[in-house]
Amino acid sequence: MPQKPIWSNAKTHQKILKKLYLFGFSGTPIYAENTQGFETTESVFGECLHRYTTIHAIRDNNVLPFCVSYHSTIKQKQDFDTSKDKQVKAIDTDEALLSLQRIDYITNYILEHFDTQTMRNAKAYTLNGKRLRGFNAIFATQSIPMVMQYYKEFQAKLDKIPESQRLKIGIIYSYAPNDKLESLESTQGLEENAEINALEQSQRDLLDSAISDYNAMFNSNFDSSAEGFQNYYKDFSLRLKNRELDLAIVVNMFFTGFDATTLNTLFVDKPLRYHGLLQAYSRTNRILNAARSFGNIICFRDLEEQTDKALALFSDENAKSVVFLKSLEDYLNGYIDDKGKKHKGYLELLKELQAKFPLTNFLESTLTETQKRTS
């Protein structure tokens, strides 16, 4: 059952209060395409009065554009027997997504590219009286079992690195005191009620272990009791905002209502769509300083189609050129924009320069000048 939105009583209020005027403000309104069982925003509040979209915010320098890259880590439909029923195919897919080879590949990728993606070699800046270089990241995963797999793999690899060079990695997911595991599809309410989901014993044990590692990193004393977990969540959130944590591995937390100007990168290994996708991406595009010119999104799932759909729904079908920076491949090889205009890439421009101003002529003239001076 989808959760009741906070504005679900609006129609009741309108019936009782005949002269009531309601103004609804929403960053990601509910349309027919993304209702998921809810009423649309228009059916509750009426016709939209004004739209201020991501395009406007970027052009007004209120937020940054995104740079999105897609990394194929699993073959899609052709890998799975279409004759199987949905439940069996889902099991096959889960096994492939949680395979040790895939987890190892993605973990290695993040560790090898972390400093580059989070700009650790950029010019230092001051935050809360501290001098910092670069930014930090969130790693969004599909499920608690996936968080567990990744955390174990990261810890195993970090143990082989000198302590001074290790990333500070933390995980957080919510549970209830009983053993009834519930759906983690919705991101609503997790921050307000961190005990909404129950955990199996193995999941609870790993969370305890991760909190213990966190305590060792920051000389704290949190635990997974009801009060202890709430305090852990608050401290975790604060350290993420202050860039004391390098990487937070999560399932659904910190995707809505969490703003950290030091957070520039989102690694994604989960399905996202419509408002959930834009809310997750938008954790990375807050303005801090000149070193940050875009929000950095690295997808280990094929989210390109869902990304385009979300942008078209909440902004404009032609917004892509404003909201998303071109890929490195486009800048290297050239591209054709939405209006059909061709833009030459770096490689083609370099060839043109070499043809017009060959280095052989430069070397010959330099040699001649040198000979004149020595003769």
Regions found by a protein language model. Give the residues of each.
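Intrinsically disordered or highly flexible coil/loop and linker segments, enriched in small
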Residues: 4, 22, 63, 116-123, ...
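Signature of the SF2 helicase/ATPase Hel1-core->accessory helical subdomain module
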Residues: 1-92, 103-107, 255-325
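Alpha-helical structural motif
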Residues: 9, 50, 102, 106, ...
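Conserved C-terminal RecA-like helicase domain
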Residues: 95-250
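Hydrophobic alpha-helical scaffolding
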Residues: 3, 43-44, 57, 93-103, ...
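Short, conserved secondary-structure transition motifs
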Residues: 30, 142-145, 171-182, 299-309, ...
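Long, hydrophobic alpha-helical segments
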Residues: 288-375
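Conserved coupling segment at the C-terminus of the helicase ATP-binding
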Residues: 28, 72, 141, 366-372
